[in-house]
């Protein structure tokens, strides 16, 4: 499990990205890089990390499911992910 503070920080970044998305879009189209630079650093979408919704793990996360590889495998083998089954050929 990731530290709660790390997960909370990432959630705060998500909120900031959502809040400033329209303003950032306008400034980019206008080419006003000085005003863009004055926006909060964490309002940039590239600072948000995809994290597992169950464990908060930041690496090995399947974006489609929002789960890290460990939880994905566990839930898939338990049959809790609809439409997912173990491959065999």
UniProtKB/Swiss-Prot annotation:
One of its GO terms (molecular function) is structural constituent of ribosome. SUPFAM superfamilies: Glucocorticoid receptor-like (DNA-binding domain). It comes from the Bacteria. GO terms for cellular component: cytoplasm; small ribosomal subunit. NCBIfam families: PRK08881.1. It comes from Chlorobium phaeovibrioides (strain DSM 265 / 1930). Belongs to the universal ribosomal protein uS14 family. Keywords: Ribonucleoprotein, Ribosomal protein, RNA-binding, rRNA-binding. One of its GO terms (biological process) is translation. The keyword rRNA-binding applies. PROSITE patterns: RIBOSOMAL_S14 (PS00527). InterPro entries: Ribosomal_uS14, Ribosomal_uS14_bac/plastid, Ribosomal_uS14_CS, Ribosomal_uS14_sf. The keyword Glycoprotein does not apply. Part of the 30S ribosomal subunit. Contacts proteins S3 and S10. Binds 16S rRNA, required for the assembly of 30S particles and may also be responsible for determining the conformation of the 16S rRNA at the A site. This is Small ribosomal subunit protein uS14. PANTHER family: 30S RIBOSOMAL PROTEIN S14, SMALL RIBOSOMAL SUBUNIT PROTEIN US14M.
């Amino acid at each position: 499990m990731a530290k709660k503070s790390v997960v909370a920080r990432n959630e705060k970044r998500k909120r900031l990205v959502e809040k400033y998305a329209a303003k950032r879009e306008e400034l980019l189209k206008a080419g006003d890089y000085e005003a863009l630079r004055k926006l909060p650093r964490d309002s940039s979408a590239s600072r948000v990390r995809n994290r597992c919704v169950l464990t908060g793990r930041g690496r090995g996360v399947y974006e489609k499911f929002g789960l890290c590889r460990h939880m994905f495998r566990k839930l898939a083998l338990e049959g809790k992910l609809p439409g997912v089954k173990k491959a065999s050929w």
